[in-house]
Structures are given as C-alpha cells and as structure tokens.
Amino acid sequence: MSAQDKIIKASHLITMDDIIREGNPTLRKEASEVSLPLSDEDIILGEKMMQFLKHSQDPVMAEKLGLRGGVGLAAPQLDISKRIIAVLVPNMEDSEGNPPKEAYSLQEIMYNPKIVAHSVQEAALADGEGCLSVDRLVEGYVVRHSRVTVDYYDKKGDKHRIKLKGYNAIVVQHEIDHINGIMFYDRINSQNPFAIKEGMLIIE
C-alpha cells in the first residue's frame, strides 16, 4: 500500500508517524505536478493535510495524537512526491486578549503552487524556522523574499494568484521549498548563521 493510499483512508488521521524526517530521499526530490482535473485521491490528500494542521493547532487534539504544532505541510513530508501544500496561519489575540475577527490570516490547500514574482528585499524570521521533518533545533536566519506572488490551483481546478508578505510569505516559501527538494537550513548562511544582509527585513 502506498503512503497516499494509507493516508486517504476515511478512518486515517495524519500523525507524526506519517511524516518522514530529514535524510529521507523523498525530501530532496523535485516533486511531480498533479494532473488537472484533480483526482479524488489528490483532493482527499489535501483535505487530510489541512485536517492535520488544524489538529496540530488544537491543544486537545495535539495532545491526544502527539502532534507538534505546524502552520504548513507539503506532500513530500508524507513521502508523497507531489506538488501539494497546505498552509494554516492563525491570527493571534489582540493585546487585550480578545479573539481575532478572522481565525486565520491564511488558510489554503494549494495544488502546483509556483512563485511567479518576488520582492528584491529579503526577509527572515527573528526566531528562525522549524520543520515537522526536522527533529533538531537549527539556529540562524533563513533568508527568503519578503514578498511573493504565488499562482496555484484549488481543489476545483480553479487557478488563483495571491500576493503575500511577511510571515505568510515565509510560510508559503518554506512549503514550496519542500516540493522543490529544498530544506529550510539550506538557506542559512553556514559561515555566519545570523548574518544580516543590507536591507533585509527581520520579522519578529
């Protein structure tokens, strides 16, 4: 049974056991585009990936299933070499503890996502990046574009173009790297991990 056949079973919930770790060759492959119109199997896979992210951000479900919190997941992390990503970025409470008007600033399953334009300005998260496929702490600035324009298809096969900046842009770039066989630490300066290039935006 393939990894995808197992994951798309109605009764299956994605857990950390389904996520492959660094060193697995699938994480270093350029993933294949999915064909359109999408197969039921690829639609279900995307929905399962989004379900995993929601579970990982729910304290009760995360504890029950033993999940690490995540804001993005790419199909290659499930040992499925396809160009499918899911991103789920929650909005935070305001300074007075009030819940946000919208629960998420970005919630999307993207098929064949592609960066079609990007800013000259670079950016990195102040606290660095982590990855569900990496079980160790890797410190340093992960240098990315501060703004990106991304084309992708949704599960209906409709094409979309979105412009992203800041944290959302970083998350989507991290996941698109996965479908291109790139790990986040490839983008850290190995000689000086906390080097700041001129004009680089540090996102707190």
UniProtKB/Swiss-Prot annotation:
Q: Does the keyword Hydrolase apply?
A: yes
Annotated active site: 175
Alphabetized InterPro entries for the sequence = Peptide_deformylase (IPR023635), Peptide_deformylase_sf (IPR036821)
Which reactions fall under this protein's catalytic activity?
N-terminal N-formyl-L-methionyl-[peptide] + H2O = N-terminal L-methionyl-[peptide] + formate
Q: How is the cofactor bound?
A: Binds 1 Fe(2+) ion.
Which residues participate in Fe cation binding? 131, 174, 178
Tell me the superkingdom of the source.
Bacteria
Where would you find the membrane-spanning parts of this chain?
none
**EC number(s) on file:** 3.5.1.88
Q: Return one GO MF term.
A: peptide deformylase activity
* Biological processes annotated in GO: co-translational protein modification; translation
Recorded hits in SUPFAM superfamilies, A to Z, give:
Peptide deformylase (SSF56420)
Entry annotated with the keyword Repeat: no
The record's CDD domains line, in alphabetical order, gives: Pep_deformylase
Q: Which cofactor does it need?
A: Fe(2+)
What's in the keyword line of the UniProt record? Hydrolase, Iron, Metal-binding, Protein biosynthesis
Q: Which PANTHER family match?
A: PEPTIDE DEFORMYLASE, PEPTIDE DEFORMYLASE 2
This chain's function reads: Removes the formyl group from the N-terminal Met of newly synthesized proteins. Requires at least a dipeptide for an efficient rate of reaction. N-terminal L-methionine is a prerequisite for activity but the enzyme has broad specificity at other positions.
Q: Which NCBIfam families match?
A: pept_deformyl (TIGR00079)
Tell me its family. Belongs to the polypeptide deformylase family.
Provide the protein name.
Answer: Peptide deformylase
Q: Which organism is it from?
A: Streptococcus uberis (strain ATCC BAA-854 / 0140J)
